[in-house]
Every structure is written in structure tokens, then in C-alpha cells.
């Protein structure tokens, strides 16, 4: 608050000890402490009153609006998110009329996509099986190398 370091406080304490005397020094420090406490309380109360007045006036809402308006990155990202959501909902095959040509093509595309996903999953599982088999063979070879031969 006053931006005093330890050396400044020490100098103030020594001067107070010389001027006031050791007998009245605790009373002086107690009174100074009370005064500083009251000053802090008044400052806190003033700050709270100013914040309440600003809240009632709608300053926070205006501030949020200004921040949103001046931050073009968030605005651009909101546009991208909205476009991605719209794109995803536009590709939903259940949205089209099943009797229309578009609905038939969408259903056909959805079926093809399911087949591709199933084939991809099968190929990935086969690859993992091959890799696991190769690792199992390596482990068996390593175990065989560790086993001691028959002693004669």
C-alpha cells in the first residue's frame, strides 16, 4: 500500500523509538495500526460501492460486448463452428425424404459408408493380429534363447 521495504520500516521504528520513547511506543504502534485498518476498510468500502454502481449501470455487460466485438478471432471461430455444425447436419441421410431421388442417393451413400467403415475395421483388426503374431513369435524365440540346454 505504501510501498515500504524492511529497511524503511526499520528506520521509521528507530526514529519512533527515539522520538516517542520505549514506554509509549506500543501505544503509538497500536494507534497507527488501528488508523491503517480503518483506512483500508474505507478504501475497501469505497471500491465495493464503485463496483456495485458500475454493475447497476451495466458496465460489465458493455465491457463484455466490447471485448466480444473487438476480438475477431473468437468471432471467426464462432462462424467456423456454426458452418461445421451446419455441414454435419446437411450430410445427415435421415434428413431427406426416402422417396425422393436425393433420399435414395443419400441412403445408398450411407450404406456405402458403413461398408467402407466395416472393411477398414476388418483390415485394421487383421493388421493388429499379424503384428501380435509376429510379437508372439519374437517372444517365443527370446524364451527359447534363455532356456539352458540339457546338461550332460
From Swiss-Prot:
Name of the protein this chain belongs to: Sec-independent protein translocase protein TatB
Membrane topology: Single-pass membrane protein
Record's subcellular location: Cell inner membrane
A Pfam family recorded for this sequence: TatA_B_E
Assembly notes: The Tat system comprises two distinct complexes: a TatABC complex, containing multiple copies of TatA, TatB and TatC subunits, and a separate TatA complex, containing only TatA subunits. Substrates initially bind to the TatABC complex, which probably triggers association of the separate TatA complex to form the active translocon.
Gene Ontology cellular component annotations, sorted alphabetically: TAT protein transport complex
Keywords for this protein: Cell inner membrane, Cell membrane, Membrane, Protein transport, Translocation, Transmembrane, Transmembrane helix, Transport
Keyword Transmembrane helix applies: yes
Parts of the chain that traverse the membrane: 1-21
GO molecular function terms listed in the Swiss-Prot or TrEMBL record: protein transmembrane transporter activity
Function: Part of the twin-arginine translocation (Tat) system that transports large folded proteins containing a characteristic twin-arginine motif in their signal peptide across membranes. Together with TatC, TatB is part of a receptor directly interacting with Tat signal peptides. TatB may form an oligomeric binding site that transiently accommodates folded Tat precursor proteins before their translocation.
Any one Gene Ontology BP term: protein transport by the Tat complex
Family: Belongs to the TatB family.
Species of the source: Ruegeria pomeroyi (strain ATCC 700808 / DSM 15171 / DSS-3) (Silicibacter pomeroyi)
The organism's taxonomic lineage, starting at the top: Bacteria, Pseudomonadati, Pseudomonadota, Alphaproteobacteria, Rhodobacterales
Amino acid at each position: 500500500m505504501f510501498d515500504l521495504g524492511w529497511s524503511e520500516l526499520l528506520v521509521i521504528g528507530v526514529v519512533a523509538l527515539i522520538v516517542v520513547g520505549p514506554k509509549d511506543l506500543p501505544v503509538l504502534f497500536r494507534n497507527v495500526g488501528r488508523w491503517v485498518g480503518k483506512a483500508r476498510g474505507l478504501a475497501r468500502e469505497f471500491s465495493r460501492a464503485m463496483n456495485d454502481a458500475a454493475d447497476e449501470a451495466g458496465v460489465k455487460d458493455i465491457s463484455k460486448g466490447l471485448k466480444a466485438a473487438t476480438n475477431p478471432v473468437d468471432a471467426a471461430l464462432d462462424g467456423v463452428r456454426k458452418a461445421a455444425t451446419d455441414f454435419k447436419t446437411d450430410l445427415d441421410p435421415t434428413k431427406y425424404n426416402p422417396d425422393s431421388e436425393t433420399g435414395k442417393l443419400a441412403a445408398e451413400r450411407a450404406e456405402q459408408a458403413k461398408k467402407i467403415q466395416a472393411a477398414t475395421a476388418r483390415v485394421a483388426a487383421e493388421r493388429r493380429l499379424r503384428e501380435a503374431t509376429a510379437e508372439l513369435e519374437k517372444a517365443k524365440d527370446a524364451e527359447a534363447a534363455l532356456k539352458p540346454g540339457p546338461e550332460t
